[in-house]
């Protein structure tokens, strides 16, 4: 994906330690927000986002429709942010359960991508292949509808990286003739 060049737009203005003013200062390799009072450096790192790719028996992909916010009415592969103290696999299962009412088993990482579409919040997204082990789809949390879609009939998506990921899924599926993405045919790694 495209690298976002510096300088970054300043998002934080006060030191979290002492309340002093934060300003960008040049260090060896880049600008960093530095407290003018105590010298604290506020490192700006991407947040980890997690998403789970789930297909039904017909090989259709589960998507959720977002409610509220700037992506209202647009669809996405069910996703969320990892909590600071949360294991990445557990966090993925939790987010998926909150948004779709489905309990999943993680099979493997499908892809990892940088998300730069929101300048206020860069993330690293991890898309897992997963399969449903319990529950019926019901929208919750940030979603108001969940539905399965064939890969060639995907509705309007909220996030550019979901486009990339779905294109990868299409390629993988067509390369493997039938479907190696079907839950029963995904090799489980331990
Ligand atoms: Zn400070």
Predicted segment positions?
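Acidic, metal-coordinating catalytic segment for phosphate/diphosphate chemistry
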Residues: 4-51
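Short connector loops at helix/strand junctions that flank enzyme active sites
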Residues: 30, 45-50, 70-72, 77, ...
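Conserved N-terminal beta-strand and adjoining loop/helix that marks the start
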Residues: 37-61, 81, 112
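Unchanged
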Residues: 82-106, 112-168, 177
């Amino acid at each position: 994906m495209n690298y976002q060049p510096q300088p970054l737009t300043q998002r934080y203005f006060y030191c979290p330690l002492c309340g002093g003013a934060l300003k960008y200062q040049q260090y060896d390799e880049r600008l960093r927000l530095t407290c003018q009072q105590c010298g604290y450096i506020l490192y700006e790192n991407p947040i980890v986002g997690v998403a789970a790719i789930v297909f039904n028996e017909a090989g259709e992909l589960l998507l959720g429709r977002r409610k509220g916010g700037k992506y209202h009415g647009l669809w996405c592969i069910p996703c969320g942010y990892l909590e600071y103290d949360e294991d990445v696999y557990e966090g993925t299962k939790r987010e998926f359960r909150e948004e779709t009412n489905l309990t999943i088993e993680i099979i493997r990482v499908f892809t990892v991508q940088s998300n730069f579409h929101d300048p206020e919040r860069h993330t690293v997204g991890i898309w897992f292949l997963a399969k449903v082990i319990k529950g019926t789809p019901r929208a919750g949390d940030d979603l108001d509808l969940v539905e399965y879609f064939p890969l060639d009939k995907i509705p309007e998506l909220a996030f550019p990286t979901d486009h990339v990921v779905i294109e990868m899924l299409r390629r993988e599926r067509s390369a493997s003739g039938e479907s190696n993405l079907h839950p029963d045919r995904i090799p489980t790694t331990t």
